[in-house]
Amino acid sequence: MDTKQGVLDILNDLTGEDLSDQMDENIFDNGLMDSMASVQMLLSLQEKFDIDVPVSEFNRAEWDTPNKIVAKVESLENE
């Protein structure tokens, strides 16, 4: 499974929405995600992709669209 599909699967589980056609939509501004969902998302991403994203270092502006989430996960996978 590629990173994009894995991220979309997690977001679908958390939001109940297929976001594949909304890759640049802000998932916080449109009400699909809140702070509790952010924590769940980070935990799911860490488990699925074996990456480390401390909640204390989470900057919502860097993770607010599906495309940004995919890019962050890919950069953390390459560390």
Curated annotation (Swiss-Prot):
Keywords: Cell wall biogenesis/degradation, Cytoplasm, Phosphopantetheine, Phosphoprotein
Location in the cell: Cytoplasm
Ranges for domain Carrier: 1-77
Main location: cytoplasm
Superkingdom in the source lineage: Bacteria
Disulfide pattern: none
Pathway given in the UniProt record: Cell wall biogenesis; lipoteichoic acid biosynthesis
Example GO molecular function: D-alanyl carrier activity
CC per GO annotation: cytoplasm
Record PTM text: 4'-phosphopantetheine is transferred from CoA to a specific serine of apo-DCP.
Role: Carrier protein involved in the D-alanylation of lipoteichoic acid (LTA). The loading of thioester-linked D-alanine onto DltC is catalyzed by D-alanine--D-alanyl carrier protein ligase DltA. The DltC-carried D-alanyl group is further transferred to cell membrane phosphatidylglycerol (PG) by forming an ester bond, probably catalyzed by DltD. D-alanylation of LTA plays an important role in modulating the properties of the cell wall in Gram-positive bacteria, influencing the net charge of the cell wall.
Keyword Manganese recorded: no
Name of the protein in its database record: D-alanyl carrier protein
HAMAP family, sorted: DltC
Annotated InterPro entries: ACP-like_sf, DltC, PP-bd_ACP
Family in the record: Belongs to the DltC family.
Primary gene name: dltC
GO BP term, example: cell wall organization
Modified residues (O-(pantetheine 4'-phosphoryl)serine): S35
